[in-house]
Amino acid sequence: MRKTLLVLALLSFAGAAVADDEVFDKAYSMEGVSRVSVENVNGKIEAYAWDRPYLKVRAIKSAHGVRAQETLRLTEIRVRKAGDEIRLETVNPRRRRLFGFLDFGWQNAHVDYELHIPTLTQARLETCNGKVIATGFGNSIACDAVNGSIELKDVFGPVRATTVNGSVRIVFRGPLKDSRVETVNGSVDVAFDRASSIRYNLETVNGRIEGDFQLAVEGKFGPKEARGSYNGGAESLRCETVNGSIRLKAN
């Protein structure tokens, strides 16, 4: 009896350890398209701007457990064109029922996106469990995450970046444009050209507010905020966090 139970346990463990993956690799014309949006659930999004006139999408789906292959088969990378926008979406299978009850052994796939998007495209990137990285965009960009950091490099803006558990780091190419940054558990770092003209509003509860230029910080312990302008205040910058510091850097 003990041997039988041991064999069954080993088989169960072996089944749970099964892993599989599948690659989605396609390109789409950007004729008549000025916006691209991505909605993911579990997995990171990496987006790179380039000078080619088409969108390149590479998504790696991975799944674990005895139903790994079935999970991959039922997980869809949906691509639709609506007006001037191409929309990408990870569509997970509906949770199965077992004897009338939800099957809690079911696991959704993990999908990592790597995108190459024309430089002047407006981008909106969203994921729940994963980080967002974007580089080189010459137009507005919006990023949302729940459990994951956001890192934007060499961007023109305007920028909107929101997460719950994760830090946000933004490096502008040139002067800062209107931007809003929010997180709960994480720090905020924003770097921009010294020629920027900014009206800033910065708030944190458990953290510091710092800059390599003079900031009018109110509050020494507990909640802190800083409001003011830099070089006239033509563009707005609002940063909020609860547990983390806010740092501004003029390059």
List the model feature ranges, each with a label.
Residues 1-251:
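Intrinsically disordered, low-complexity terminal regions
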